[in-house]
Swiss-Prot record:
Gene name for this UniProt entry: lldD
Any GO BP: lactate metabolic process
SUPFAM superfamilies, sorted: FMN-linked oxidoreductases
Cofactors (names): FMN
UniProt protein name: L-lactate dehydrogenase
Signal peptide interval: none
Origin species: Escherichia coli O45:K1 (strain S88 / ExPEC)
Membrane topology: Peripheral membrane protein
CDD domains: alpha_hydroxyacid_oxid_FMN
Length: 396
């Protein structure tokens, strides 16, 4: 099979993975309107082509939280990576490390902090959910600090799980789910051998270490469902800010006022995100939400963005809309499921090449030169010829 884009990895992953895993990764909340808009809205962002500029010294390097990145991309937190490839978190982290970008370990990873951190040279990032069990949160933070994690990504858009219709149909949940998953596994031999048999243990490593006993997929579904905390507020985050002495990023911002609250709280960064369309269907795509948020807090806090990014062109679009760096989710997971570390490494190379093409043809020699001036049209609205700063109304 010829691999030239993330879409090729998606097609390959669908053949390799049991349906319950593919659709858990690929699906979104409710009718998946926001999931689709994340991708479609980015595709409507038209760039301004410029020609006859000397682009021989083009550079993708950037700095974030005093870390040098080879390009403004990080691998975002994705749960259960180790169910998509053998010890998947370790493989993805190694690919990111080799490319000179951060890897973010999810709270609900298969491989625990202590397995992933020693496998790479640069400090990894760690993602934490808002959970009722504050003992687990403190334990996870202590272990992340001990392992040398540099940045905490605190996910706040999951006070309750989203309703994901695909999960019930695919076997992740619903009637006879365990039996359906077993039957799917035995009919997908490549996955069954590589991950099902040789990728064990299939624990939720970070949670198992805390509970002192093995955990599995049923524990993942049940433990998380019982531990999400809808009562959380900014005040509840103060002890985390006091405890964590490194950069702290608030993930799940879609409104400018919430972004301003993050600045007032003292966060070092935000992630403009709708959780990949997996939480509340019908909310703004990240591409639509980003310009107004950037207008409100750009320069006061680092702005990261995710949801809908599939290639290097999308990275350039997000930066032009106001992001400093982007997080990849599904795109790298498709590659991981298809070819492990090598797949993720190849995807990152593709994204880098695509970024270089986009920057060359828009006349941006550096990441700092990718601005709103790089845009001609945003979400169906043509910008003035002078390309004046985008009006706030354009973001809605």
């Amino acid at each position: 099979m010829i691999i030239s884009a993330a879409s090729d990895y998606r097609a390959a992953a669908q053949r390799i993975l049991p349906p319950f895993l593919f659709h858990y990764m690929d699906g979104g909340a409710y009718s998946e309107y926001t999931l689709r808009r994340n991708v479609e809205d980015l595709s409507e962002v038209a760039l301004r082509q410029r020609i006859l500029k000397n682009m021989s010294d083009l550079s993708l390097e950037t700095t974030l939280f005093n870390e040098k990145l080879s390009m403004p991309v990080a691998l975002g937190p994705v749960g259960l990576c180790g169910m998509y490839a053998r010890r998947g978190e370790v493989q993805a982290a190694k690919a990111a490390d080799a490319h000179g970008i951060p890897f973010t370990l999810s709270t609900v990873s298969v491989c625990p902090i202590e397995e992933v951190a020693p496998a790479i040279k640069r400090p990894m990032w760690f993602q934490l959910y808002v959970l009722r069990d504050r003992g687990f949160m403190r334990n996870a933070l202590e272990r992340a600090k001990a392992a040398g994690c540099s940045t905490l990504v605190f996910t706040v858009d999951m006070p309750t799980p989203g309703a994901r219709y695909r999960d019930a149909h695919s076997g992740m949940s619903g009637p006879n789910a365990a039996m359906r998953r077993y039957l799917q596994a035995v009919t997908h031999p490549q996955w069954a051998w590589d991950v099902g048999l040789n990728g064990r243990p299939h624990d939720l490593g970070n949670i198992s270490a805390y509970l002192g006993k093995p955990t599995g997929l049923e524990d993942y579904i049940g433990w998380l469902a019982n531990n999400f905390d809808p009562s959380i507020s900014w005040k509840d985050l103060e002890w985390i800010r006091d405890f964590w002495d490194g950069p702290m990023v608030i993930k799940g911002i879609l409104d400018p006022e919430d972004a301003r609250d993050a600045v007032r709280f003292g966060a070092d960064g935000i992630v403009v995100s709708n959780h990949g369309g997996r939480q509340l269907d019908g909310v703004l795509s990240s591409a639509r939400a980003l310009p107004a948020i950037a207008d409100a807090v750009k320069g006061d806090i680092a702005i990261l963005a995710d949801s809908g990014i599939r290639n290097g062109l999308d990275v350039v679009r997000m930066i032009a809309l106001g992001a400093d760096t982007v997080l990849l989710g599904r795109a790298f997971l498709y590659a991981l499921a298809t070819a492990g570390q090598a797949g993720v490494a190849n995807l990152l190379n593709l994204i880098e090449k695509e970024m270089k093409v986009a920057m060359t043809l828009t006349g941006a020699k550096s990441i700092s030169e990718i601005t709103q001036d790089s845009l001609v049209q945003v979400l169906g609205k043509e910008l003035p010829a002078a390309l004046a700063p985008m009006a706030k109304g354009n973001a809605a």
